[in-house]
Amino acid sequence: LSLVGSEMCIRDSNYMDVKPDSNRPSVAYFSMEYGLNHVLKIYSGGLGVLAGDYLKEASDSNVDLCAVGFLYRYGYFTQTLSMDGQQIANYEAQNFGQLPLDRVLDENGKQVVVDVPYLDYYVHAYLWRVNVGRISLYLLDTDNEMNSEFDRSITHQLYGGDWENRLKQEILLGIGGILTLKKLGIKKDVY
């Protein structure tokens, strides 16, 4: 039994050293949410759990994949009920310093900023990284002093706000995601 355990530890320690299979196309995966762990509140349910499972399986299957999404300040709400049975949505701010993620830094040690065009101005998003096995998940965060209060809220809540904010989220994910990969020098075969 201990020999089997030792062999498994050796095999698992080499797991992360294996390079992606270059015979398969490389992939850039974009999603509004990723269900990786309850600690990181960047998902609400089915789509997020599925997207998170894709990343975990890509890592296990040695697929050359990276992903882009959002680092939500408040995530999705937690639900409580009032005395008369009405739903109450509670939003709790995430403390990014206590989450399993890292700031993406440039060669000067400054956090990387992605500048995303919106009509006649730019929204500026900080870049964070979560390691999902061998897979890098890059998260965009607009809650910073470079943006107006209105644009800081783009990444406050998953699916939160009005239709305009939702459209801004979709622009940030699509255009901002491509700009993120370009800024990091990442090129993939399939998007």
Language model features by range: what are they?
Residues P20-H38:
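Structured, charged N-terminal subsegments at the starts of enzyme catalytic cores
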Residues N37-V68, N147, I154-Y191:
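A conserved hydrophobic secondary-structure block that centers on an alpha-helix together
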Residues L3-I10:
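Short, small-residue-biased leader/transition segments that mark boundaries at the very start
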Residues S13-Y15, S44, D84-N131:
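Extended, Lys/Arg-enriched charged tracts that mediate electrostatic binding to polyanionic substrates
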Residues Y34-V39, Y72-T78, E145-E149:
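Flexible loop/turn segments at secondary-structure boundaries
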Residues N108-L179:
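Active-site cores of enzymes that catalyze phosphoryl transfer or operate on phosphate-rich substrates
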Residues S31, A67-L71, D141-T142:
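Glycine-rich, histidine-containing beta strand-loop boundary motifs that form or position
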Residues K56-P100:
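Hydrophobic or amphipathic alpha-helical targeting/insertion segments
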